[in-house]
Every structure is written in structure tokens, then in C-alpha cells.
Amino acid sequence: MSYQFPDNFNYADTHEYVLEENGLLKIGVSEFAIDQLGDIVFVELADQGKTLEKGETFGTIESVKAVEEVYLPFSGEIVSVNESVIDNPELLQNDPIGEGWLVIMKPESEESIADLMTSEQYKSKVVPK
């Protein structure tokens, strides 16, 4: 499978992507990680309005292969939860970097994405040469 690595995305070591939009940060899981999980059967996400610290889990993705937690790559408040992914987990599988986003966060600080990988750095980590 060939994966997309949009230039405007940043990535955490734990395969979450971050997309900055109007001062808010949209978070999801990379196509690579979703492909490794196989068929997604259940998604659970933290509630809107919840404030979390960097490294805390904000959700769980259950597939036929495994149950994986998703981690917050920075501290902040959840301002929106993608209810569509909870109702239709296949959205996450079919379009993880589009309609399959998980939450939108208001970051605690401007430097939130400074520690994350660029698309090129992430691609070199997950795609064999």
C-alpha cells in the first residue's frame, strides 16, 4: 500500500498526526498505523471540554488484531470530537487523514508541535528505503 504524507502534517512517535487549522490542532492516526491495525471495529474518544496533558490517552481504537490507545502529543483542551468516527469506525480505516480525524484540540502553548516530526521525517521512519 502507498501512504500519503501531506506536507502540512506533523507526526508523533506513536503515529498520531497533527494538522494546524486556525490556531487549533486536528489530531488523527496515520494511514501507516491504521493499515497495521487491520479492520477497525470500535473507536472510543475522550469527551469534548476535557483538558489533557501531553502523553495522556485520549482514545482507544479496537481492531480485529489489537486494541490500541491513542496518545496526546501535547497538552490542551478537546474542543471537538469526531462523533462520525465513533458511529462509523470504518471512516477511520477508509480515510484516516481526511474524514477519519479523531479530535480537535486547543493547545496549551504555541510550541505544541515543535517536538513533532515533519512528514518527511515520519515517512523515513515508517517506509522502508
Regions found by a protein language model. Name each.
Residues 10, 44, 62, 68-72:
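Small beta-strand-rich domains/subdomains or short beta-sheet motifs embedded
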Residues 75, 79-80, 87, 93:
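Charged, amphipathic alpha-helical coiled-coil/dimerization segments
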Residues 1-54, 90, 94-129:
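Acidic, low-complexity mobile loops and tails
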